[in-house]
């Protein structure tokens, strides 16, 4: 007997976490069903050969005519992201509304009386607008690349100093095109919070800049989990303890998917601790220096000798930018990786940055181009300590045994609520 089909349809789904989220919540198998063209989406919807599906970009409006019944909330928003097949009749819902409302509430973002700037005019824009309007926002502004309709150009939006909350509803900064950003939060002196519906990476460039400004910043992962939990209620017809399930599943999966990036002085034990930590956390281990050697075909001392440090740092930045896009990794970095601020930002996008500290006299410096020991090593430590402090999110004192260091690293990671 053929199993009922549950899954997600969309144009491109390579970045999706929906399968692991749904299968964590419920007991059905959940499939990713990419439909690159409207013709394929049309055929899929006409066949109705599914029990229940979620819908993502670019089909949230496209599927509405195929629904026999559309929930009033979804009808008002003009977007459907959840469809349930009940005896051949398709029922359409929008759980993004509740998901975004959950995200805002979980981070203490209150729209009442606030001026809100929404980036983008796609399907999620209408959902976010509805939540902000229902939350009592004083003014809701929209910005887009074209400035069509009532939307401002992004450059025009930067001249609205009264903006208090920014919400990004565009795919800008989403995997694999990480590092992109439409506006600079520094331009908004009254800014209180930035929310980004992008969930991969955990922290987009927009959110990293918001954190630098000291304002509340939250990505879309909790929204993704919340809307999935609410969708599961429609899929199964069962009411769930959403108040308990959403934060628990969000926390568990963020820890499962997060990278742990390790920085510190040459010879402090980054690779040794990292390899053991990866095994304990069941994550892939990446030694960045080894990866650079693999990709360039040259060992690092030879690169320094033949091409110089500047060339090595370019290789390092390029390799790190690619590696850091992944998830569920422990990444052991070279000692000088923090000399480039862009590297530190890349490491922060998908998890904590662990600074391993070890006494100078205990550092292993053999075969390392820039750490020869003695006075030079002390000078190197003095130069880099402020950079390690700025780049790291947590500190590991590696003064004892490997087992003790790994135990402490696991404890720090599992206790980290800022992933």
What are these regions (language model features)?
Residues 290-348:
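ATP-dependent small-molecule kinase phosphotransfer cores
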Residues 349-387:
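A glycine- and Lys/Arg-enriched "phosphate-lid" helix/loop adjacent to the NTP-binding pocket
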Residues 244-255, 276, 280, 326, ...:
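NTP-dependent small-molecule kinase module
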Residues 10, 92-97, 104, 109, ...:
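Glycine-rich adenosine-cofactor-binding loop
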């Amino acid at each position: 007997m053929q199993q009922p089909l549950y899954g997600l349809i969309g144009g491109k789904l390579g970045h999706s976490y929906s399968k692991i989220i749904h299968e964590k919540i419920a007991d059905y198998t959940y499939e990713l069903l990419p439909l690159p063209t409207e013709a394929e989406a049309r055929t899929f919807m006409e066949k109705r050969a599914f029990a229940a599906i979620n819908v993502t970009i670019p089909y949230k409006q496209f599927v509405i005519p195929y629904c026999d019944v559309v929930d009033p909330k979804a009808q008002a928003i003009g977007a459907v992201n959840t469809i349930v097949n009940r005896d051949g009749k398709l029922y359409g819902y929008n759980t993004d509304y509740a998901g975004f409302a959950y995200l805002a509430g979980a981070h203490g973002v209150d729209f009442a009386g606030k001026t809100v700037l929404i980036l983008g005019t796609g399907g999620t824009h209408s959902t976010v607008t509805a939540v902000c309007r229902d939350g009592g926002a004083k003014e809701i502004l929209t910005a887009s690349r074209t400035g069509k309709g009532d939307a401002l150009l992004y450059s025009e939006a930067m001249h609205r100093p009264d903006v208090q909350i920014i919400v990004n509803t565009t795919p800008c900064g989403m995997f694999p095109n990480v590092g992109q950003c439409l506006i600079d939060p520094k331009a908004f002196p009254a800014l209180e919070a930035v929310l980004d519906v992008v969930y991969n990476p955990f922290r987009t460039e927009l959110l990293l800049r918001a954190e630098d400004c000291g304002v509340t910043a939250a990505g879309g992962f909790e929204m993704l989990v919340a809307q999935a939990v609410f969708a599961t209620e429609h899929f199964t017809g069962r009411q769930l303890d959403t108040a308990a399930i959403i934060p628990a599943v969000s926390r568990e999966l963020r820890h499962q998917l997060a990278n742990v990036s390790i920085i510190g002085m040459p010879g402090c034990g980054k690779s040794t601790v990292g390899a053991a930590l990866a095994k304990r956390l069941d994550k892939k281990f990446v030694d960045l220096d080894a990866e650079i050697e693999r990709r360039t075909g040259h060992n690092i001392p030879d690169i320094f000798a033949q091409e110089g440090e500047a060339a090595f740092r370019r290789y390092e930045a390029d390799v790190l930018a690619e590696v850091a896009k992944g998830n569920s990794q422990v990444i052991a970095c070279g000692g000088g990786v923090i000399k480039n601020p862009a590297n530190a930002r890349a490491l922060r996008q998908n998890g904590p940055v662990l600074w391993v500290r070890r006494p100078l006299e205990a550092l292993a410096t053999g075969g390392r181009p820039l750490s020869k020991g003695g006075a030079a090593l002390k000078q190197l430590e003095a130069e880099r300590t402020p950079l390690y402090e700025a780049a790291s999110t947590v500190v590991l004192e590696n003064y004892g045994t490997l087992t003790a260091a790994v135990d402490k690293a696991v404890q720090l990671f599992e206790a980290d609520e800022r992933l």
